[in-house]
């Protein structure tokens, strides 16, 4: 047994009495569902709830397939020391995953330069660092639900919306020096020097505000509400800070800029058959999510950076988007957790990165099909060999599509590390799927590999939608729409080449800066750590309603 393998520690703890390489096992001797402390807790609560609601049947683990035929495994959240029950990784049971999704949905970036130009050129009002600071005070009063323009307006209790605020950033160091440090996202402080210079060169002298609408708003409404909530308060705050007349024609220009012209949302609107507005998970492009995750500003390890992106994306795309918005139910959690538990994908990715570093060097070769074929084949075969050598690893990833996703993710990321090219990376993924199917005759459920069979022809063509570069693809990209066990890994492959090159951002420098924000309760520098805290019930979410409900309820 090779003790260097990253997943062995987790396997030994998960299965306890069975060695990871043991070829024979037992069934129905582990205590059934009662071996799980969480399922016992569920059962106790369900009995009380059933009585309270007049005997209407409720949760009963004895219904359906017998639970606990084998070990009900704990899961080690990769990159941490936390062992958690699988149930606690379901997004409904995990406050951190909920908050991550909420933080994305409730964020909107709005350019300030159009509004400043209207003030100066149409209204003859001077804009200075002092007036900008005054405006930022006004928006931080109005955005959570405070009134600024007229009397007899109802307001929101601040205790319900403590998480709501607006911040500002700019690529102009001179302006940044004069802005209120309480509301400034300081690029020079939050990013390594080289990354900061790269970001400032892209942003230039432009100025942007980042508005975090209250969590409770996106819980009650949806992501499409966010730009509207933001725009209304922006208009009111400009009127207040610059002493404008609410009815004059120039106010329409503020409204247009705040609602449309200068708005950067986290996700695009979905088509009618998916019926979701902007800022919903299905519209978040893979490169956008890679920029939302902040691992690249605190680590220079391409593997770790990519793995953190995959973990967060697993929760967003597989658990919440496909698993609930598009499907509903509980089963998609297991697809997602395969990519961020027990250090299995970590082992495969680090193996691939070491192979690449030894043979080519990081970003050391051109993106050719020969390179794709070599790296993808090597990493895929290594991954499949581990499943054959360690039966408990195979049991951990009990579904064929789990194994296919993890092996292909490692192949794709490794190819991207070598080439610094996401298109080469995604073709490494596609080849891995084909090799895997050749070896095992099938992958996962029927149609799992539909998109992988046609992937190379799409990604190597120039077409209006199928030929889209990988970073700009997302859950709504043709053929990517429904098959679980793909989208999180695609986000990691979008990140991998940029992590290898040391880029400051993947797709959008504004989004990268917007989430370099220490006041967010979800830690986007380390999604796995936050998800683990949520599973351990150690994560405190925003948007709670204790202030307005009866005590003790």
Swiss-Prot record:
Its cofactor is coenzyme F430. This is Methyl-coenzyme M reductase II subunit alpha. GO terms for biological process: methanogenesis. Its EC number is 2.8.4.1. Belongs to the methyl-coenzyme M reductase alpha subunit family. Binds 2 coenzyme F430 non-covalently per MCR complex. Coenzyme F430 is a yellow nickel porphinoid. Methyl-coenzyme-M reductase is activated when the enzyme-bound coenzyme F430 is reduced to the Ni(I) oxidation state. The keyword Cytoplasm does not apply. It catalyses: coenzyme B + methyl-coenzyme M = methane + coenzyme M-coenzyme B heterodisulfide. MCR is a hexamer of two alpha, two beta, and two gamma chains, forming a dimer of heterotrimers. The lineage of its organism: Archaea, Methanobacteriati, Methanobacteriota, Methanomada group, Methanobacteria. The modification 2-methylglutamine is found at residue 402.
